[in-house]
């Protein structure tokens, strides 16, 4: 089997994908790309605005195009949005074109990490954000597990420690 050179980070919002991804890219001297940031740059608008104007469907279409394009690059660490796995096409591209790492976290930790963040459209203007996170986990966690080459809980470790663990696990995967 040819060695997979890309590393794709998946998992729920607040799992640390972007923070860990930056550390990982630095350790491996690879480019770091965040699919949500890429969508915002190309749209010239933030994700909340895209959700407001185009709805979640419009956002997901943009996300599919971006993930298809980004996963064709070589030597990148890609942090995906929490809902990227909802698309079968995204799951196929991610699992076929790189090492998929599922950064797992508890709903409680997610809630702590996201409660002051105003850039999470699915958590805005809802009565019970914790319940929304629970509902999302029920749908998305099995999809994360379906395509993950490696699963790592992120609740207790710093981003730097997590990035180092990922490097070791990838070395073992290909050792």
From Swiss-Prot:
Lineage: Bacteria, Pseudomonadati, Pseudomonadota, Gammaproteobacteria, Pasteurellales
Keywords: Amino-acid biosynthesis, Aromatic amino acid biosynthesis, ATP-binding, Cytoplasm, Kinase, Magnesium, Metal-binding, Nucleotide-binding, Transferase
Keyword Amino-acid biosynthesis: yes
InterPro entries: P-loop_NTPase (IPR027417), Shikimate/glucono_kinase (IPR031322), Shikimate_kinase/TSH1 (IPR000623), Shikimate_kinase_CS (IPR023000)
Keyword Repeat listed: no
EC number: 2.7.1.71
Protein name: Shikimate kinase
GO cellular component: cytosol
Binding site for substrate: 36, 60, 82, 140
Pathway(s) per entry: Metabolic intermediate biosynthesis; chorismate biosynthesis; chorismate from D-erythrose 4-phosphate and phosphoenolpyruvate: step 5/7
Source organism of the structure: Pasteurella multocida (strain Pm70)
Chief location of this protein within or outside the cell: cytoplasm
Pfam families in the record: SKI
Cofactor note: Binds 1 Mg(2+) ion per subunit.
């Amino acid at each position: 089997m040819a060695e997979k050179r890309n590393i794709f980070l998946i998992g729920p919002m607040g799992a640390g994908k972007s923070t860990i991804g930056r550390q990982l890219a630095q350790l491996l001297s690879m480019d770091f790309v965040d699919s949500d940031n890429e969508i915002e740059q190309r749209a010239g608008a933030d994700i909340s605005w895209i959700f407001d104007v185009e709805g979640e469907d419009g956002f997901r279409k943009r996300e599919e195009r971006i993930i298809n394009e980004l996963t064709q690059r070589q030597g990148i660490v890609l942090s995906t949005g929490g809902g990227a796995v909802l698309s079968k096409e995204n799951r196929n591209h991610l699992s076929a074109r790189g090492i998929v790492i599922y950064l797992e976290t508890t709903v409680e930790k997610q809630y702590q990490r996201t409660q002051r963040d105003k850039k999470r459209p699915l958590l805005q203007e809802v009565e019970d954000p914790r319940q929304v996170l629970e509902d999302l986990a029920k749908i998305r966690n099995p999809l994360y597990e379906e395509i993950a080459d490696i699963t790592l809980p992120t609740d207790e470790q710093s981003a730097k420690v997590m990035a180092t663990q990922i490097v070791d696990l990838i070395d073992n995967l290909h050792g």
